[in-house]
């Protein structure tokens, strides 16, 4: 395993940063390391990095522990993204024209300069449409600058909620939605969609299911007494991570896409 590339998921939360490193064998997934790094107050606020310099200072000792051969999948808060669905245009477009059309359409929808946005899109599996996810360029630039300061290799920046999709194959057949919660929010994902709900006034899985208009029995919750994300890792050696769902997003990022 010493020569394998470490796949690392890094999840920056309001009070802490958590990270998980795995390597892949021919048929198995091996846990290498996990980290839990407390963050001072006001470094991150409502998903936005407020004090990038202090964040870099906190993460620098961690970054120095990483092997040279690594890829980091970095979480981007779903609260800082915008999602829209647009019907496919009637005319056939090449990839470049299609990207330009979606960029302009999204910018007009949000009344923003196209250059101020970065976006990704996929074809809707259930209808003739494109699902577009956008974020402000300056917020992504902040993360890339952080990576440069830490001298780490970032291979992907991914909405945090979408990382939960990686665990859906591990759920019982009657459950199609996985949710994760911290003090401020719920993150949720199904095979075809993902998102975020504020936790205020929504304290149970039943209330979340009602907000999503799904059967409560179809929702699994990450954490003790619910779904254990570590089931997705074939081989775990001590020191073992704490039980519960605190590392779910970071682990999902490290594992990569399920579909």
From Swiss-Prot:
KO phenotype (gene knockout): Mutants are unable to use DNA as a sole carbon and energy source. They do not show a growth disadvantage in stationary phase growth in cocultures with wild-type.
SUPFAM superfamilies named in the record: Actin-like ATPase domain
UniProt-listed GO biological process terms: carbon utilization; DNA catabolic process
Highest taxon, organism lineage: Bacteria
Functional description taken from the UniProt entry: Required for the use of extracellular DNA as a nutrient.
UniProt protein name: DNA utilization protein HofM
